[in-house]
Regions:
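Domain-level detector for secreted/extracellular nuclease and nuclease-toxin modules, and
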Residues: 1-182
């Protein structure tokens, strides 16, 4: 979790990467891209205010968290004015850090519904292969212990926009899943 693995900036690499506990690094974005890094209980997000979507979301998923049965939600949160942009748009609100990975904490679950953790996704992707990949990651966490997951949209200069708030609509997404070993 972002609270257990507090994000720190490595002074020697301050211009090149965000360093998380355990040494995992996420490269900083090019200067032309906007980013505000926000730490939540269950994940950290690099939020792009121009496109109103995440640049990336990173979190740890442990075997204990992957087997949690608690289910709190759904919730609203920051940037809720953007929700109406999704209504009848033909796009799902695709979670980057899925609510299903945050069942271990009511606060983490609530924060997973923040729109800074959401990107427009076509229903076939969100309810299909993306959901399958989220479920597979939970299985891997149960089998292997802890995973570090970094996920997000591929942001290009030609993104189409959604609604009056002009939310960026990514064409493609990525999810990097790494096993954490001591």
């Amino acid at each position: 979790q972002a609270t257990k693995n507090k994000q720190t900036t490595n002074p020697k690499k301050e211009t090149s990467a965000y360093t998380f506990q355990g040494g995992a690094e996420i490269p900083r974005l090019k200067n032309k891209q906007k980013e505000q890094v926000i730490k939540h209980e269950g994940y950290a997000v690099s939020y792009n205010s121009d496109y109103k979507i995440a640049n990336w979301v990173a979190y740890e998923l442990t075997s204990k968290e992957a087997t949690s049965k608690k289910n709190e939600g759904p919730y609203g949160g920051e940037f809720d004015e953007v929700v109406e942009d999704y209504t009848r748009s033909g796009y799902d609100r695709g979670h980057m850090a899925p609510a299903g990975d945050m069942k271990w904490s009511a606060k983490a679950m609530r924060e997973s519904f923040y729109l800074s953790n959401i990107c427009p996704q076509k229903p076939g992707l969100n309810r299909g292969i993306w959901k399958d990949l989220e479920e597979q990651a939970r299985l891997w966490a149960k089998e292997n212990g802890s995973l570090l997951i970094v996920t997000g949209p591929v942001i290009t200069d030609d993104l189409k926009r959604l609604g009056k708030n002009r939310v960026g609509i990514p064409k493609t997404f990525y999810k990097v899943i790494c096993t954490i070993t001591n």
